[in-house]
Amino acid sequence: MALKKFNPTTPSRRQMTMPTFEEVTTNAPEKSLLVSLKKTGGRNAQGKITVRHHGGGAKRKYRIIDFKRNKDGIPAKVATVEYDPNRSAYIALVVYADGEKRYILAPVGLKVGDTVVSGPEADIKPGNALQLKHMPVGTFVHNIELQAGKGGQMVRSAGTSAQLMAKEGNYATLRLPSGEMRYVRIECKATVGTVSNTTHEIVNIGKAGRKRHMGWRPTVRGSVMNPCDHPHGGGEGRSPIGRPSPVTPWGKPALGYKTRKNKKYSDRFIIKRRNAK
């Protein structure tokens, strides 16, 4: 999980860092678990831009990941640890005792040859998946379900983990990576351990071309647009925005405008918000 630096042949190479990929064991994915991905350019079915600055980028194939971990009691052996262009974490190809192959999120410390298993009898070790009610308090987990059987939805990014803080009645209390304290049904599954590629958050992209490879196009400032394109646009030369505070292209407050509904159903499960003092 180290970072590679480069000789300063250009100003961008001086700053650029990249993972060493020392945990990755192969660059040939399992073909039966690949699906083609179509480029959208940030457009929806009507052709309207729904995500700005999207387009281009290297071709990718989607890897089908097993977020449900529903083959209980059948051990699986780790065949490879691979890079996945669609997510920040590494993935592991596991081969079950009955011959089925699946991809799972690779936790820190998982190596080729290790055995993982899911179900109530599973040991508390990285890569094993079981319901929260079968885990001891204090366990670090990832790939957490919000509804039992639906598959993991929370804590899937590189280097993240949540901690099981308490179990009471039908609910377990989790501390999420954001600092939020939240109830989750005790029948929900989670995977033990921390997600791999922990140095992802300190990688320096270094140059614009690398961002283009990822499918991100340049972001134009509103102040250099025309008034018809942005509320900050217009004026002679470098003009001030002419407003008390910056806004989005649609006139909404920028820089931290709250968009969460104040009567959302899941509010009852949140004990402490992530930004609570």
Curated annotation (Swiss-Prot):
Any single GO molecular-function term of the entry would be:
transferase activity
- Pfam families, sorted: Ribosomal_L2, Ribosomal_L2_C
Any idea which UniProt keywords this protein has? Ribonucleoprotein, Ribosomal protein, RNA-binding, rRNA-binding
Q: Output the superkingdom of the source species.
A: Bacteria
NCBIfam families named among the record's database cross-references? rplB_bact
Spell out the subunit comment: Part of the 50S ribosomal subunit. Forms a bridge to the 30S subunit in the 70S ribosome.
**Per its record, how is this protein called by name?**
Large ribosomal subunit protein uL2
- What species does this protein belong to? Clostridium perfringens (strain 13 / Type A)
Q: From the UniProt record, report the name of the gene that encodes this protein.
A: rplB
